[in-house]
């Protein structure tokens, strides 16, 4: 433990970008240490795009390793610089100040209570993640009104002791947006999911949605726990192109899915209501899209879009992600496209920036 504390103090003193690995969770936090106490730390974190994404409190007992140097950190430093150079929308950075000589965990909970911040908690010996609003903070007890974006009927009051809390995420982009949206979310009523599962109805349903405002979710056969949320852009003879929304309600690129791989279309759900509200709030704040992206692309429904997208990616050396019939996930870029074959140059996330330069 002493070596971990020494590493954390070094990262704080030298303002080093670090990866913090946890003992009980696979989530790795990347960022700058802003406060170190005898029981925990505050880490100002960044998302995968290099954008400030709030902060996290980590109990010292939850920290397994502090990494100072790696390809992943070099990659993230490049992304952070790119986000600054391209003036990415940054609405979720750490703004709170903390005293390292006082109980950090209690400071975070008290700030959240006073400022009505949405938090994400991880508890000891509990694999669940809890999102909610702090409703009370006492010496040995904290109450949290849970929020469930997927089911508005499942939002109980959680009472726990502070010593059971290992991780607290706060002020991140998604959590901040949830806080802004909360008064509006509380006015929305629960809706039972409306879905289309009959494959014969997929094409007519999707064609009716082309170019329209309603958000839908597409659920693929290969992983029915995975789903894509967005608006239908184009329907071809064998595929559908969707303008995606990410978890913060911003434009998140495009996905092309074969109709034969589609398991279900979700037309109504509580989560779709939530994402629609997030998207509307982003528009009102003039933050619907990052400046380097283009959400106005049109695609020819009469063209084989699978071949067209692969040929274009090869021509411009664009990074794409492929999902094969057997569920294999590949990230990289194609070349030598011709006939029914092409060469795919697979890379990992740590290589993306070097390829993209």
Region spans (language model):
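Short, conserved beta-turn/loop elements at beta-strand boundaries and strand-helix junctions
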Residues: 36-41, 68-71, 137-142, 170-172, ...
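Low-complexity, glycine/alanine/valine/leucine- and proline-rich hydrophobic stretches
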Residues: 335-336, 341-352
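Hydrophobic beta-strand residues in large extracellular and virion-surface proteins
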Residues: 18-20, 33, 41, 119-121, ...
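Short glycine-rich, low-complexity segments
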Residues: 1-28, 47-129, 148-225, 246-327, ...
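Short beta-strand-centered aromatic/proline hotspots
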Residues: 29-35, 128-136, 226-234, 329-337
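N-terminal beta-strand/beta-hairpin edge segment
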Residues: 33-34, 38-51, 244
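Short acidic, gly/pro-rich beta-turn/loop elements at beta-sheet edges
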Residues: 30, 41, 53, 142, ...
């Amino acid at each position: 433990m002493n070596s971990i504390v020494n590493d954390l103090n070094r990262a704080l003193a030298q303002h080093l970008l670090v990866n913090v690995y946890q003992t009980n969770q696979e989530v790795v936090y990347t960022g700058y240490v802003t406060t170190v106490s005898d029981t925990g730390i505050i880490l100002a974190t960044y998302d995968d795009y290099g954008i400030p994404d709030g902060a996290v409190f980590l109990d010292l007992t939850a920290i397994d390793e502090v990494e100072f140097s790696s390809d992943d950190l070099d990659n993230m430093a490049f992304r952070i610089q790119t986000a600054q150079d391209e003036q990415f929308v940054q609405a979720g950075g750490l703004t709170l100040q903390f005293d390292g000589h006082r109980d950090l965990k209690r400071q975070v909970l008290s700030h959240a209570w006073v400022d009505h911040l949405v938090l994400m908690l991880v508890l000891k010996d509990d694999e669940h993640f809890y999102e909610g609003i702090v409703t009370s903070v006492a010496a040995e007890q904290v109450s949290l009104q849970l929020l469930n974006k997927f089911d508005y009927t499942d939002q109980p009051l959680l009472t726990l002791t502070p010593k059971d809390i290992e991780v607290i995420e706060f002020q991140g982009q998604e959590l901040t947006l949830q806080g802004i949206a909360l008064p509006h979310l509380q006015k929305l009523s629960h809706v039972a999911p409306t879905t289309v599962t009959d494959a014969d109805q997929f094409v007519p349903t999707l064609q009716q949605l082309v170019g329209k405002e309603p958000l839908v979710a597409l659920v693929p056969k290969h992983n029915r726990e995975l789903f894509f949320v967005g608006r239908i852009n184009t329907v071809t003879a064998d595929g559908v192109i969707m303008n995606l929304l990410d978890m913060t309600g911003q434009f998140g690129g495009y996905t092309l899915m074969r109709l034969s791989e589609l398991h279900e279309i979700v037309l109504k759900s509580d989560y779709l209501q939530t994402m629609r509200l997030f998207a509307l709030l982003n528009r009102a704040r003039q933050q619907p899209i990052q400046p380097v992206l283009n959400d106005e692309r049109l695609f020819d429904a009469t063209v084989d879009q699978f071949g067209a997208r692969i040929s274009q990616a090869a021509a411009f050396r664009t990074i794409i992600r492929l999902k094969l019939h057997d569920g294999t996930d590949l990230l990289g870029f194609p070349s030598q496209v011709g006939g029914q074959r092409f060469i795919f140059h697979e890379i990992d996330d740590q290589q993306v920036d070097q390829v993209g330069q």
